[in-house]
C-alpha cells in the first residue's frame, strides 16, 4: 500500500509498505480522508517537540471504513464507517486523568492514517452515523481537542471568551464556545481571511493584531476583561496577551504547541491578577461522541474550515510546505479512498 512515512526533520517519504498483520483485537480500516494536524507540522519542522517514533506512518486525524476485524473484536464489523480516537489510553473510562499521562498515540507510536489502510486497536475506533460524511468525520479529532478545552474551562451561558489564533483549533474553540452559550466571542489573528472564517463560525468581534493592540481593544469593549481566554496560536506574544486580556480571577487555557521557550513576567502578571493558567490535551469519550453527534446533525459548520483537498503523492509539497508558506490555509485534507 502507499503510505507517508516520517523519518525526521523535513523528511516525510511516500513509500510502498506492506499492510501489517491483523491481531485479534485489531481492525483494518480502509482510510478515506486524513487531515494534517498542527502537531504533524511540528514533527516535520521541530522533531524534538513531538514525541514520535521514527519510520512511522504519520497521521492521526482520519476516517474510513472497516474492511476486516480481528477474532476478538466484538463492537465492530466489516462495513462500519468510523473515525479514529488516536490517544491510546490504557483505561479510556478514566480519560479525564489519563489523557494527561499517556502520550502514546496513533500516528506517533503506531502507524497512522496517511496510508491506504490502517491496522488499529479496536479501542481507538469510534463508529459514525451514516449521515456524517467521511471527509467531515476526519475532523472529529481536532474538533474534540477544542471542545474539551472549552469544557475544561467550564464556559457557561453569558460568558465572554477570547480566542488567540484562528487556525483549525482556534476556529473549533469558537464553535465550542458558541455551543456552550458564550455571549461574546472575540478572536485575534494576523490574517483577515482567518478572521472572516472566525466570524462565519460565530465570533462576535475580531481583531487583526497587525493593525491594533488586541488587549487594548478587548479592554475597551470589556473593561474587566474576558471570563476566559484560549491561547491557540503558540507564540510568546499571544501567550502574554491572553493573560492580559483575562479578568481578575479568570482563566487562560493553553491548547497550542510552543516549540520554543517563552518569556513572561509570571509573578507579576499572575500574583496581581489572580489569573489561572491551565492546559488541556486530548478529550474524553463523552466529548468525542458529542462532537460526532454535532457534526452529524449539522450543528457545526466544519466544512468551512477545509481549505484544500490533496492526494497523498502531494502531501509534502501541497500539504506541509503549503501550511508553512501560505498562512491562508487552514485544514488540509488528504484524499485516500475519497469515499463519502
Residue ranges and their predicted role:
Residues 7, 19, 53-60, 106-110, ...:
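Short Gly/Pro-enriched turn/cap motifs at secondary-structure boundaries
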Residues 20-34, 47-89, 129-131:
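Glycine-rich beta-strand-centered segment in the early N-terminal region that forms part
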Residues 82, 132-211, 216:
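Mid-domain Rossmann-like dinucleotide-binding core that forms the NAD(H)/NADP(H) cofactor-binding site
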Residues 88-164:
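NAD(P)H dinucleotide-binding glycine-rich loop of Rossmann-like/cofactor-binding domains
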Residues 153, 201-276, 339-340:
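Glycine-rich cofactor phosphate-binding loops and adjacent beta1-alpha1 units
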Residues 240-244, 285, 289-340:
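C-terminal hydrophobic helical "lid"/dimerization subdomain
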